[in-house]
Regions:
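Proline-threonine-serine-rich low-complexity tracts
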Residues: 1-200
């Protein structure tokens, strides 16, 4: 910027001189961040952008850009994570601040079941395990346990029976689905005979 200095003495004589004034902005922006909570999606992933954590960052000359790091999260990041918001003004001054990013998994397992047929044994009993009903249930963050509403069957259960499979993931999210267990009794009756003597 060019400015002109004009000086007038007591006798009215005037003299002027031009000078260059260089204006610099060395003031960093004010970076302000907020803590947030995000949910993983069904694939076990989540991402954020600077606007998600920015809480009114500002600069007198204007903000040129913002970045946040890290900005992608997965099952290994569950819980509290520290992220850094970097704010750059139009004159390339930067400022940083941190926020807490809490990552949660609220997605229930994806359920796939199958119907099965089982046979009673010679004692009229049969039992199953969850893996016989499960047909590929999955969860992005891993499965912790499988459970069935009914494991044991007897003669009173011959025919179609509805059982419920419960799958719980590593973060306590549970889902259920039904399947049909058909119980069959194909064991022939045991016939016992004895010889007898009769008198005419």
């Amino acid at each position: 910027n060019t400015v002109t200095l004009t000086v007038t003495d007591v006798n009215g004589n005037v003299s002027s001189k031009a000078a260059t004034v260089i204006v610099k902005d060395n003031v960093a922006p004010l970076a302000i961040a907020k803590n947030i909570t995000i949910q993983l999606d069904a694939t076990g992933n989540a991402s954020i952008i600077p606007a998600d954590v920015d809480n009114g960052s500002n600069d007198a000359c204007g903000i040129a850009s913002q970045t946040v790091a890290p900005n992608t999260f997965d099952c290994s990041n569950l819980g509290a994570n520290r992220v850094t918001l970097t704010v750059t003004d139009v004159n390339n001054n930067t400022s940083t601040t941190t926020a807490t990013m809490t990552v949660e998994d609220m997605v229930v397992p994806d359920m796939i079941t199958q119907n099965i047929t089982i046979q009673l044994d010679v004692y009229g009993d049969a039992s199953i395990v969850a893996s016989q009903i499960d047909n590929g249930s999955s969860d992005a963050c891993g499965i912790a346990s499988y459970g069935l509403s009914k494991y044991d069957f007897d003669c009173s259960n011959v025919g179609a029976n509805t059982v419920t499979l419960t799958v719980t993931d590593n973060n306590g999210n549970a889902n259920t689905a039904n399947a049909t267990v058909t119980v069959q009794d194909n064991i022939a009756a045991e016939v016992l005979t004895q010889n007898i003597t009769v008198q005419l």
